[in-house]
Amino acid sequence: MKNKRVIKKNFEFQEIINYKKTIKNFCFVIYYKDNEESYLKYGISVGKKIGNAVIRNKVKRQIRMILKQNISEIGTVSKDIIILVRKSVLELKYATLSKLLIKLIKEIK
């Protein structure tokens, strides 16, 4: 089953980043743009400066799970978002990451 909420193509990432609307905290930078759909679409980018491949994939899995578990809270946001992860994410626990990310996404509304 294809997940229609995920942004994967490079040109889609570039389009949203070039739109230049951002919101950030010490863990995440979120680029966002309005979309025509009635749901949130997201892409996750973790740079190579953050750990090795195992660590980067773990962070991406955690972010996907946070979004999946909290979709009822953030589902009304009809935006395309790109989540850029900063290195400070490695020092935080999952519960803290969840609170920070959900709070940031809610601010987009």
Swiss-Prot record:
Top-level class of the enzyme under EC nomenclature: hydrolase
InterPro entries: Ribosomal_Su5_D2-typ_SF, Ribsml_uS5_D2-typ_fold_subgr, RNase_P, RNase_P_CS
Known function: RNaseP catalyzes the removal of the 5'-leader sequence from pre-tRNA to produce the mature 5'-terminus. It can also cleave other RNA substrates such as 4.5S RNA. The protein component plays an auxiliary but essential role in vivo by binding to the 5'-leader sequence and broadening the substrate specificity of the ribozyme.
EC number: 3.1.26.5
Organism classification: Bacteria, Bacillati, Mycoplasmatota, Mollicutes, Mycoplasmataceae
Annotated GO biological process: tRNA 5'-leader removal
Quaternary context: Consists of a catalytic RNA component (M1 or rnpB) and a protein subunit.
HAMAP family named in the record: RNase_P
UniProt entry keywords in alphabetical sequence: Endonuclease, Hydrolase, Nuclease, RNA-binding, tRNA processing
Superkingdom of the source species: Bacteria
NCBIfam families documented for this protein: rnpA
Annotated GO CC locations: ribonuclease P complex
Protein name: Ribonuclease P protein component
Family per similarity comment: Belongs to the RnpA family.
Recorded GO MF terms: 3'-tRNA processing endoribonuclease activity; ribonuclease P activity; tRNA binding
